[in-house]
Amino acid sequence: MSPVLTQHVSQPITLDEQTQKMKRHLLQDIRRSAYVYRVDCGGCNACEIEIFAAITPVFDAERFGIKVVSSPRHADILLFTGAVTRAMRMPALRAYESAPDHKICVSYGACGVGGGIFHDLYSVWGGSDTIVPIDVWIPGCPPTPAATIHGFAVALGLLQQKIHAVDYRDPTGVTMQPLWPQIPPSQRIAIEREARRLAGYRQGREICDRLLRHLSDDPTGNRVNTWLRDADDPRLNSIVQQLFRVLRGLHD
């Protein structure tokens, strides 16, 4: 009896719910592909590498109808990368003015979002939001291809809203409660800034969130002590002690 060959048998392709939703946006609402134009405002090209990785067959952003074009006059989505330098400010503005309405502006990468490590240089204006109105932010240094495609998905939803002039407003009287209402905003901001300075953006935010959660549940600090004892990490202990010094300085 001859063996059954399986390597050349065609397998059906199944799409997840998010992919199907994006395709419905393109086919029913936008009714055409969404064209993306890159505006390099003065970056190191790491963001460009990730953008091109996102449109390769591995991640295949084109399956959602997302295509990169070479002229802003054809673009629906403008993708601003890099910190805005003085030399690139006017070219970036010309690209923005050349793109037809209704356009979506995306700030891509840490430098595009807020200037990154170059934010305070004499030749840098800051993030791309200093020169154009930004609709979508994609943070990262650089953002991953998965984060890039997710940002494109958000941009597609906004593009649909702009094309059909859809506006959303919160119901009257509805307010958002802070995550930790027991802790004043000034203290939360000071702790988060110091934690990010000591441990970086990602780990600093995680340490800050966990510390605030423990302090919110147990102001006596017993849960914080248990957390530090279980972690058994001298570096974490040093960071948390510094954050407590910041808190005491605010109370003094």
UniProtKB/Swiss-Prot annotation:
Enzyme Commission (EC) number: 1.-.-.-
Superkingdom to which the source organism belongs: Bacteria
Co-factor: note: Binds 1 [4Fe-4S] cluster.
Cofactor(s) this protein cannot do without: [4Fe-4S] cluster
GO MF annotation: an example: 4 iron, 4 sulfur cluster binding
Binding site for [4Fe-4S] cluster: C41, C47, C111, C141
Gene3D superfamilies hit by this protein: 3.40.50.12280
Keywords (A to Z) from UniProt: 4Fe-4S, Iron, Iron-sulfur, Metal-binding, Oxidoreductase
Keyword Oxidoreductase: yes
One Pfam family of this chain: Oxidored_q6
InterPro entries xrefs: Complex_I_20kDa-like (IPR052375), NADH_UbQ_OxRdtase-like_20kDa (IPR006137), NADH_UQ_OxRdtase_20Kd_su (IPR006138)
Keyword Ribonucleoprotein in record: no
Functional description taken from the UniProt entry: Possible component of hydrogenase 4.
Family statement drawn from the similarity comment of this UniProt entry: Belongs to the complex I 20 kDa subunit family.
Name the UniProt record assigns to this protein: Hydrogenase-4 component I
Annotated organism of origin: Escherichia coli (strain K12)
